[in-house]
A protein has these predicted regions:
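General marker for long, soluble alpha-helical cores
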Residues: 1-273
């Protein structure tokens, strides 16, 4: 048994058939993950690391240690302090942090991370975990390219003061008009602005729908709407966007209209009709 620094100097004679059969017990309470990998590589016997209460190092190195379950014994409840920052500008792959979180019941200190990348679901998992500490000011690149829910983007936006950027290849945003306008209007979210939008409301205020239409050059699918409310001017603006070529709003035409004006021009009403 011994401290990790001494154990790293043990012979690693590859000429011995089957390798060394050192019985090793690490006496340190805090160990760098890459050093532990070096030590268990020197023996064919599982290294006892039950004295270790803290692992430090890069996420990849720590996960390598946990994955080598036949090489060590006594791991699973350690605190972990990681040293990753931004993966050379590409953002730390958040799925690897979630894997690490699953590998130990101890707290994972992630305060060195300055940038993430990954799916929105994985990002929300990391920020929602009680086992990960030190998060809250990272930038995040969301890699999803198919469909995202605006409410989920807003949730992620609320968990970090860093800017959250969606993929330039994102195809569709979905959600209520309120949630969508919140997402597009947030200084903490950077959304491309050319994605299609599918709204889920059955009733919407025309002004809010027009505001949404101004946020994206993609077509807004309003098929779920049964009622449109608002001033006649705003309602006419929304329906004109549906009638335009190319249209920027689709699905309007058979909704109940509830006007909020007290006085309207007959010509404007004829336009709506």
């Amino acid at each position: 048994e011994g401290d990790i620094s001494t154990l790293k100097t043990l012979s690693n004679d590859n000429s011995i058939s089957g390798g060394h059969t050192y019985t090793i017990t690490v006496t340190d309470t805090s160990v760098v993950a890459s050093d532990l990998t070096t030590v268990y590589g020197k023996t064919s016997v599982a290294v006892d690391v039950s004295n270790v209460t803290t692992l430090t190092g890069l996420i990849a190195d720590v996960n390598t240690v946990y994955a080598a379950s036949s090489e060590t014994s006594g791991l699973g409840n350690e605190a972990v302090t990681i040293s990753d920052t931004n993966n050379s500008g590409n953002g730390v792959d958040v799925s690897t942090l979630n894997t690490l979180d699953d590998n130990t019941t101890g707290a994972v200190d992630a305060q060195t991370i300055s940038a993430f990348s990954g799916s929105l679901a994985n990002l929300l998992t990391a920020y929602g975990s009680n086992g990960i500490t030190g998060l809250g000011n990272e930038t995040a690149s969301v890699t999803d390219t198919s469909t995202l829910a605006a409410s989920d983007l807003n949730s992620l936006d609320s968990k970090t003061s860093g800017v959250v950027t969606t993929s330039t290849s994102l195809a569709t945003l979905t959600g209520t008009v309120s949630a969508l306008n919140t997402a597009y209007g947030s200084a903490g979210l950077s959304i491309q602005g050319d994605e299609a939008v599918t709204i889920t409301d059955t009733t919407v205020n025309a002004k809010d729908l027009n505001d949404l239409n101004n946020y994206t050059s993609g077509v807004i699918n309003a098929d779920t709407l049964t009622t449109v409310t608002g001033t006649l001017v705003d309602v006419n603006t929304a329906f004109a966007a549906d009638a335009a070529s190319p249209a920027t709003i689709s699905g309007l035409g058979d909704q109940t209209i509830e006007l909020t004006d007290t006085t309207v021009l007959a010509s404007d009403l004829n336009t709506l009709d």
